[in-house]
Amino acid sequence: MSLSPHVENASIPKGSTPIPKNRNVSSIGKGEFLGSSSSNNSSFRMNHYSNSGQPSVLDSIRRPNLTPTFSYSNGVYMPESHRTSSFNDSYLPYDKNPYAKTTGSMSNKSNMKIKTKKNAINTNTRKSSGLIYTTKVDKELSSIDKVNDPNINGLVCAGKTHLGLYKFSPSDRSIKCVHDFITPNSNTSTRGTTSLLPKLSKRTRQNKFSTIADVKTGFNNYKNCIAVCNNSTAISIYDLNKSSSIDNPLITSLCEHTRSINSFDFNMVESNLIISGGQDSCVKIWDLRSNKSKSSNRSDISINTASDSIRDVKWMPGYNFASKNDQGSSTYGNLKSGYKFASIHDSGYLLKFDLRQPAQYEKKLNAHTGPGLCLNWHPNQEYIATGGRDGKCCLWFVGDNANAAENTVLNYGNSPSLHAPNTSLNNSGSLAFPKLTINTGYPVTKLKFKPAYSSNIYNSLLGISSMGDEAEVRIYSLARKYIPKHVLLSETPSLGLVWWDENLIFNIDKGTRINGWDINKEPTVLENLSKNTTTWRDLDGNGLLSVDQEIGSYEVVEPELQPTSSTTCKKHPGTIKNPKNGNPENQGIIGGIKKGFSHTGLTSFTPERPPTLKAGPTFSTKSLTLASGASSFNSSSASLTSLTPQTENREEIAIEPPCIITLDIPQIFNNIRLTKIAHSRKKNVISESSSMKNSPVEKFKYLARQLKFSYIREHNVSDSADTAYKNDIENIDVVKNATETHGDNTTTTNNNDDGDDDDDDDDDDDKIIESHLLKKYNFPENNTWATLMNEKVNNKKSKRNSSSSREFDEKDVRSSISSISASRQSHDRSRKIDKNVEAELQEKIQTLVDLISIATHNASVYLSIDDLTNFKIWILIRDSLLWDLKWMTSSQISSDNASNMDANESSDFEAGENLKTGKEFPEEDGAGTSGAESLVEERPQAFRANSDEPSDAEKKPVSKLKEQLKNTEIIPYAQPNEDSDEVLIKLKELQNQRLESRTKMGETVSDDVIIEEDEHEHQEEEQPHDSPTKSAQFHASPIAKSIPILQKREHRKSFIDTFMLHSPNGYNGDTDIGNEDDNISLRFTYNSVSPRSKVSSLQSYATTTSQLETFKKLSSHTAPIIGSPRHAPSRPDSIGREQLSSSLTKKLAKCKKIIADPPWDTKKLIKQLYNQATETGNVVLTVNILFLFQTIYQITEIDIAKDAIAHFLLLLHRYELFGIAADVLKYCPFEDIMGSEGDQSSIRLFCERCGELITNESSKEKLRAEAQQTGNKKIMDKFGYWYCDSCKKKNTSCVLCERPLKKLTMVILPCGHEGHFQCIQEWFLDENEQECPGGCPGVAFI
C-alpha cells in the first residue's frame, strides 16, 4: 500500500492497529473519507503543531465524489490516480516534525484524506505540493479580493452575513480572520485557533448582503477602502483601518441603481473613481471625494448602455511593471488605463467605453451565444477575456487598429510564424472573431489574468472558475488552449479566485474554505498525464490511438528586451497629484470633465474624437442635464490638465521597435495558400491512396463519397453535369459570336435567299457544337467518333459549296414542286408531331450528356486510386454513350435540315401561282408523291443544262411541262389490290410525258452533280429502311436513260440489291415472280459492278434497260411494302404476291435489327458489365450501374435492383456514411427501397396518468362482440388509444377544442400543450396568433 511521504514517516502510537497490506480498501471509493467516529483499520487522524506550542488545526477536508473515475473535462484525459489531491501536508516544513495519532472518538480535530488505492499512484507522477494555505470559516462566503497594501498580507472575503478581513502568514502558512465588519466586537479567526465568538442576543440584527454580492478593494490613496453590495441596489464602502468596536467602519453608501447591482470596480489609476453596473443596464461612475455623506443617491456619471442587464464591468488596469537593466530600472504602464472600461451583458455583447466620451461605445462585440458572465482585462495589453454560459472563454482584441499588437500564432512551443493559418495582419477581424477560444464545457463565472507583464499575449496565464460541479480552478496558458497548465483541486465547487501576485492564487469554495496555492510548486497537467496510454479508436475496433511522446510546452518564444541608456524612471501616466490649492473635486478625471462643460456651447472636448450623434448609450451628470436629442461634451483646452497623461521625462519603452516592411500581403498570402493547397493535396492523395490499397473499408468509404450514383436532380438544384452542360452551351455561344464577328469583318456575303442563310447558320452551329465536344472529351484525330464527325462536317461543306455554285431558275423549282401543294395541311400536322419528337429527343440528349459527365467523373475517381480495371470500364461506358450521343445529334440535325427544306419549299410555293390541288394525301403517307415527281423534287439539277442562265429555247419546254403538271391529277399511293394496274398505267403515262419534255431539252449532268449524288447515296446507306421505295422508283424510271455517262465504269451492286433484294438464285426480267418460292426474293444481277465504284446510283440505273413489264411486276409485288396491307382483301390469285411480300418484310426486319442493334450496342455492353460486376462481387460498380442505367436499359428485374440498393444502404449505415445514404434515398429512381423495414415502425404508447402500456385489448374485444351482435360496424370507431383501460381515464385532450386526440397530434414545444393538427393550424396560421391557446406566457409560434 502506497502512502504519502509524511504519512509513511509519521509515528503511529501503540494501541492503534495499522492497515493490513492485504486489505482491499478500494471499496472505500475515490473521494470518500477515511475518518470515522471510532477507531478502525482505515481511519487516521493527523494533527500538526506549530513552533509556538499551540496546535495549528488543519480542518477536515472532505471532498465529495463529484467527478467520475476518468475525467474528460475539456478533452483532457485524467485518471483519478493522476489527479492527485492538492490537499496534503507536503507543504509543511520537515523541521516541524509533524506526527499522527489516532483517537477512539470523533473530536473537533480534522481528519486527513489519504490515498489508499493499491498501486494507484504512478511512480513517475508528480504529486501536488502547491497548496500552502487552507482554512475553513463559519460564515458563508461568496466573493474574495486582495488588499492592495503591500504592507499587509490581507484578503477580504464577503458573504450574506459576513465581511471579514483575513491575514495569511508566510512563516507558519496560516490564515486568520482579523476583523468582521458586520458582527461588532468580533475577533473572528478560524475554528479552533481563537476563542469562540461571544453569544449574541437573539434580537441582534444581522446585516445581510445580497446573494449576488461582490467585494472589491481600492488602490493607492484609497487602498483602505472596501466596497461591497450591502443590498441589491446599494454599494457600501468600509474603512479597513476602523476595526475597533467604537468606530463605525462604514464610510458611505452609493445607491442610485433601480435594480440589483451585479458588479463594481475601483479605478487603478484614478483611485477615487468606482464604477458599477447592474440589472438596470446602467453604468454608474462615482467619485468618492464628492460623496462624503453617509448616503449618496446621485452618481457623477450615468451611462445607459441601451442593452441588456450588465453582468460584469471592469476598468482597464494600470499596473506599474518594472524592467531592470544594467544602469537601473524603469517602470511603464498603459497610457489609457484611467479612461477605458468595459462591460458584458446578458445578451452576450461586450461593450468598450472611453470615459472622455461616454455617450457612445467604442467597440461592440458579440462575444457569446448566451449570456456573458464575466470579463477581465489583460494586465498590460488591450485584450479582454470573457466567459459566458455557453462554456467558452474568449480572448478579444479591443485596442485601436493602428496601435494593434501583432498577432502571434499558437505553435505550442515553437516560434511564431507569419505564414501560419491563424495569423491575421488586419486587426479589424477582431471585431467579429475572437483571437482565442477555450472550450471549458461548463459556464465560466470568474476569470482573472495573472498580474504579470507579458510582451506576447499567448504567454499569459488565465485562471478560470466555473459554476458547475467541477471542484477545481483551472489555469490555462493561452499558448496551449486544449490542455490546462494547472488544475487546482478543491473540496467543493469554486466560487471565486484572486491572484495575490505572480505565483500565489487564492480561491473560496462552497464549503466555506479559503485555499491558497503556489503555482510554482504545482505540477502541470502534462507531467501527470500518462505517456503510454493506448485505446481503441472507435467501437468497431478499427484502429488504435496513443499519446504523442513530444510533450511540448506552455510558452511561446518572446523577443529579447533591448536595454536603454537612460536611468530616469518613467512615471505612470495616472500618477495622482496632491493638490495644495483649490478644491480637490476639481482635480482628476471627473474634475476635468466637469470643467469641460463650458458656458458657451456644447462641443466635444477631445480633439481626435469629433462629436457623433449616435443612438445608443445616454449620458448624464450631476451638474448638467443634456438635451434628449444629442448627448455630447464640451471643454476647453485649459481644463484638460488633469486628463492629459503626465509624461515628464518620458522615454521610450525598453523594447526594440518593430521594423516596418512594405509587402504585397494579398499576393504573398495567395502564393502561400496555393503552395500549401498543392502540397496538402499531394500528401493527402498519396496517403489516401496508400491507405486505401491496404484497407478495403477505406476504399469503399472513399468511393462512396466521391462517385456519382444518380443523374436525377431536383428542379431547383443543378448538379455538376447540368452545370457543365450549361457551360458548354455558353462556350458554344461565345465561340459562335466570335466566329460571326470574324466572318463579318473579313468577308462580304451577298445573301439572296433567306432560307439558305438559315441552313448555313444551322450548319455552323452544328460544326461548333461538334468541335467543342471533340475538344472537351480530348478525342484524338484518329479516333473513330472524331473521324465520323469530321467526315460529316466535310460532307456538309461540299454540299453547301455545290449548292451555292449552281443557280437555277426559280420557276423550274416552283414547277417541279407544284404537285405537292395538296400536302400543306398534312405538313402542318407532321410539324406538330415533329416538335414533340424533337422535345423528347432533346431530353434524351440531355440525359446522355449527364451520363457522359458522370462516367467521366467516375473514371477519374478510379484513376486517382490506381484502379485501372474500373477506370477502363467507365471509359468504355463513356465511349459507348458518346456513340449514342453522336447518332442522336446527327439524326436531330438531319431532321432539322429536312424541316428547314420543307419551310423553304412551302415559302417558294406560296410565292408562285396557286395551283388547284386534287385529293389530299392520307396523313400516314406524309408528303409522298409519285415516283417521277419525287425524282424531280429530290434531284432538280438532273433536269437542267450546265449553263448558269437557261436560254429561251430551254424555258419553253419547261413552260409546257408546267401546263402539263397543272392538268395532271395527283396519284395517291397504290393499295395491294386490283387498283394497282391502273396506278401503274397512270405512272407510265406521266413518265413518258416527262421523258419527251426532257429529251427535247438535251440536258447533261456535270461532275458536281454526280459527286453530290454519290454523297446522297452515302446518306441513304445510313438509313436503309427508306431505300426500298426510292429504289423501286429509280429502277422503274425511264428518265435515267437521258443522263449521259461521263466515264465507262463497271456496274456495281446498289445498296438495295445487296441488302434488300438479295436472292441466291439470281433474277431475270422474264422470270415469273409469282411462281417463286417464299424463301426466294428478288435480285438484280449486275455481275460486273465493283462494290467500291464511286458512281452514283442514278448512273448505275441509267445503263440498265428497264422494261415496262419488269417495272409493272416489281410495282405490283412491292406495293404491300409501300402501302398499308392491313385493309387489303385476300384473293386467291394474290397468294404468291403475299408470300413474296412476307419474305421481303422478314428480310427487311432482319436488316433493320442488325443495323439498329449492333454488337457494340450500349445496352448489351452495360448488361455484360453488370453481369461481370455481380460475378466478381464489385458492389460499388453494381449499384452504380443500377442507379444510372436501370430505368433506361432495364438491366435486370426491378425487385433485384431494389434489393441490391437496400443492401448497399445497409452497408452505408454500417460504415456511418449517413449523409450519403440519405442522398441515395433522395435521388433513388425507385420507391419502397427499404421495404417493410423502412415504412413500418412500432410505437408504444404509455398512459400519462398511470404509466401503464396502452393496449386496450379488453375494450377492443368488447366493442368487437357488440359489433357482431348488432351488425353495426361503426361501433369499432369508438376504439382507439386515446384512453387507458387500466385507469379508465382519457389522455390529454386538445388544448383548443378539448376533444380527445385520436389522429394526427401537434405539440407546442415551449409549453408542451397538445392539439389536433387542424386546430393548431387554424389557431396559428389562419388566425395569426402567436401565444399558446392555453394562455401560456411567451411567444409560442413565430
From Swiss-Prot:
Coiled coil: none
Keywords of the record: Metal-binding, Phosphoprotein, Repeat, Vacuole, WD repeat, Zinc, Zinc-finger
Superkingdom, natural source: Eukaryota
Ranges of Low complexity composition bias in the record: 630-644, 815-824
Gene Ontology CC terms: cytosol; GATOR2 complex; vacuolar membrane
Entry-linked InterPro entries: WD40/YVTN_repeat-like_dom_sf (IPR015943), WD40_repeat_CS (IPR019775), WD40_repeat_dom_sf (IPR036322), WD40_rpt (IPR001680), WDR24 (IPR037590), WDR59_RTC1-like_RING_Znf (IPR049566), Znf_RING (IPR001841), Znf_RING/FYVE/PHD (IPR013083)
Region of interest called Disordered, as start-end residue ranges on this chain: 1-39, 559-593, 600-619, 630-651, 736-766, 788-831, 942-962, 1014-1043
Cell compartments where the protein resides: Vacuole
Alphabetical list of PROSITE patterns matching this protein: WD_REPEATS_1, WD_REPEATS_2, WD_REPEATS_REGION, ZF_RING_2
Modified residues (Phosphoserine): S1037, S1081, S1088, S1090, S1124, S1134
Record flagged with keyword Cytoplasm: no
Nuclease listed as a keyword: no
WD repeats: 207-248, 256-296, 305-342, 367-406, 439-486, 489-527, 844-884, 1130-1170, 1217-1256
Biological source species: Saccharomyces cerevisiae (strain Lalvin EC1118 / Prise de mousse)
The protein's name: Restriction of telomere capping protein 1
Membrane-spanning intervals of the chain: none
Stretches annotated zinc finger (RING-type): 1294-1336
Biased composition range(s): Basic and acidic residues: 952-962, 1016-1028
Segments of skewed composition (Acidic residues): 753-766
Function: May be involved in a process influencing telomere capping.
Similarity-based family: Belongs to the WD repeat RTC1 family.
GO biological process: positive regulation of macroautophagy; positive regulation of TORC1 signaling
GO MF term list: zinc ion binding
